[in-house]
């Protein structure tokens, strides 16, 4: 009876896997395939299913078949302004945002052009309804109508560097730091003390 039960359970599990399974394929992308560089800093999948790959030698777009690389072109204002792409995010409405070593760039999927939004040192980037950036202990929000980054919050009296940002469903902005834990900023701008592992 045990054997019959085991065979029945095995049959059910195989049937369930077969009916729910998807064809998933995996490719190992290298410079031989067109990747601009082996060291990958960040990846992002846009609303069209395109994979964007940030490296130390430019931005790569992978459509499942081909890789196209975007790099700095001197004297071309529509090209990438910095080759080192550290982080990638997007608005799922035709814009891809890049944190580069020299600032923030925007790539328009429709026009296929880059726009430099901010030059200078930026430590973190995140998109959730708005583009948030972290510069040392300050968080800024991109104002699309003015083209400016407006101060959203300053962690007063703190000597920290923000490393990552995340906005949760309750509109709390979580701010990860390098060496100082995680801060939580509520929607009404109340900040909690650093969250440490106890």
Residue spans for each PLM region:
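Carboxylate-rich, polar loop motifs that coordinate divalent cations or form catalytic acidic clusters
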Residues: 1-198
């Amino acid at each position: 009876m045990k054997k019959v039960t085991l065979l029945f359970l095995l049959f059910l599990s195989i049937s369930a896997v077969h009916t729910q399974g998807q064809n998933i394929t995996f490719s190992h992308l290298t410079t031989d395939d067109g990747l601009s560089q082996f060291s990958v800093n960040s990846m992002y999948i846009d609303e069209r299913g395109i994979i964007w790959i940030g490296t130390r030698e430019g931005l790569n777009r992978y459509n499942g078949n081909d890789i196209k690389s975007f790099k700095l072109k001197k004297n071309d204002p529509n090209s990438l302004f910095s080759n080192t792409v550290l982080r990638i995010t997007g608005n799922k409405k035709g814009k891809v945002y890049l944190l580069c070593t020299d600032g923030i760039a925007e790539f328009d999927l429709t026009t296929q052009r880059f726009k430099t939004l901010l030059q200078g040192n930026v430590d973190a980037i995140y998109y959730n309804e708005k583009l948030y950036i972290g510069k040392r202990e300050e968080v800024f929000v991109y104002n699309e109508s003015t083209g400016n980054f407006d101060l959203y919050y300053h962690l007063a009296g703190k000597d920290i560097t923000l490393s990552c940002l995340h906005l949760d469903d309750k509109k709390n902005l979580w701010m990860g730091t390098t060496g100082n834990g995680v801060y939580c900023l509520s929607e009404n701008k109340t900040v909690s003390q650093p969250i440490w592992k106890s």
